[in-house]
UniProtKB/Swiss-Prot annotation:
Keyword terms: Ribonucleoprotein, Ribosomal protein, RNA-binding, rRNA-binding
Key word Glycoprotein present: no
Domain of life: Archaea
Gene Ontology CC entries for this record: ribonucleoprotein complex; ribosome
Protein name, entry field: Large ribosomal subunit protein eL20
Database matches in Pfam families: Ribosomal_L18A (PF01775)
């Protein structure tokens, strides 16, 4: 079984006629590809945007101690 890492994904997405909306997501995943799929799925579900409307600018692995979401920190076992 692969080790779970934390990836930070940054980019923008289009919602209708509005200007592009920036986003940053921190997601647990075993690979960059898995993290990317999670972001596509989450943004599509939450905002009703297609993959073609999402532009990824950066994806990078981050240290679990840098995670901002308290729920994700707890799941990763990072001390407060």
């Amino acid at each position: 079984m692969s080790e779970v890492k934390v990836f930070e994904v940054r980019g923008t997405f289009r919602m209708g006629d509005e200007p592009r909306q920036p986003f940053t997501r921190q997601v647990p995943a075993t690979s960059e590809e898995e993290a990317l799929e999670k972001v596509y799925s989450d943004l599509g579900s939450e905002h009703g945007v297609s993959r073609m409307e999402i532009q990824i600018e950066e994806i990078r692995e981050i240290d679990p101690s840098k995670v901002e979401d308290p729920i994700l920190r707890r799941l990763l076992g990072v001390e407060e």
